[in-house]
Amino acid sequence: MAKKRLTGNNRTLSDDWEETLRQIRTQTAVDFTMTGEEKARKLRELEADPVAWAKFMFYRYAKYEFAGFQKKAIRRIIGHSDGNWYEVLSWARELAKSTIVMFIVLYLVIVKKNKRCVIMTSATNDGARKLLNQYRAQFEANERLKYFYGNLIGDKWTEDYFTLSTRVSFMAMGWGQSPRGVKMDEVRPDVLLMDDYDTDEECRNPEIVNNKWNWFEQALFFTRSISEALLTVWTGNVIAKDCCISRAGNKARELAAREKPIGNWDIINIRMVDINNPDPQADYQFGTSVWPEKNTEETIDEVLAQVSLASGQKECFNNPVVEGSYFKEIRWGECPPIGKLKYIVSYGDPAPSNTTGKKAKKNSFKANFLMGAIRGNAVCIYRISAACHQRRVRELVLLSAGLRKGKDAAEELHRE
């Protein structure tokens, strides 16, 4: 039978796929001079250390030395894989979150053999297929996997669904598709991977976010077996105040607080002051690269310099900022002498005090801010002073009057 001739886009995709396979074969060369005993010893040594195993088997992806937080994640997830575990990896761009998860999943299905039915989910079916193709390419072309584990290709081998000779299945699925009834033999899904599940456009619509979250928690999550362990892994940085990743992260924190923890939310920014305590502002100003072997300080500086602060915070520091809600861009600087400000505004919140009941003698808290503006090439607004005290309305009025008299009077009245 004659082969069907590929044309246009299909031919380009086929050529790209063949090039990917060629690169994997080239970069996973095998030392065929090892004796059977040496080969067995080498494999035992590698399998005893998941990090060493990943570095050896997938050199193309592991060409940089692993960072500490990556090693910790690998060992944490593998260490909890025999039970129910809910992991959320909110790592900034260029920190290899999807690649690390691939190493983990392949270790579990090949070495530990405790996972047999994997579902890869993304915002679209095309996206899920592209992510799953990275796994399929390894089974198809990785010479080291073939040398140590034999031919792992099973009887079904498509972009959407493939099986291994060891009776393990992988399925790609976009959100909204029906996952009901998915099984590998008698095994229900025991690994759920959500990668690039959020999109910027969808996160602007709360109804879509709700629908996507409900689809995961109801249709997808309950494809599992109640009696068997499930590994759930989300990968994605926080791109909106309300997105599925942030909801999953909050759920993981709830699970981490249980008497027997079964979850973890790992937030890693491109730079950090303290790897265990993410702080977007402090990390941006004072942090250092969390993966210096790959991302140097100089290259991070160059990348961040080419985009707005809001974009850098969102993509590299897990801090989505809605730019333009109040001020288009904020520049921090020292306030000039008050006499040079053309406009000064005193803004207070004169909330009335409670005059009845047990708390009648307790005045409510009053707030007052003194703001100034100066006009040059652009209008600059400064916070001159701010105060929040438990006072009566009359005292707030006097405070405001003092603020209008000048900075010295303002500082006197604001002093505790």
Where are these regions (language model features)?
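N-terminal accessory segments
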Residues: 1-85
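Mg2+-dependent endonuclease catalytic cores in nucleic-acid-processing enzymes, primarily RNase H-like
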Residues: 246, 250, 269-271, 277, ...
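ASCE P-loop NTPase helicase motor core
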Residues: 204-278
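Conserved nucleotide-state-sensing and coupling region of NTP-binding domains
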Residues: 121-178
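Conserved RecA-like ASCE ATPase "motif II neighborhood" in helicase/translocase motors
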Residues: 160-216
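Walker A/P-loop NTP-binding motif
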Residues: 99-113
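Walker A/P-loop
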Residues: 84-103
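ATPase catalytic-site recognition across NTP-hydrolyzing enzymes
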Residues: 277-350, 354-357
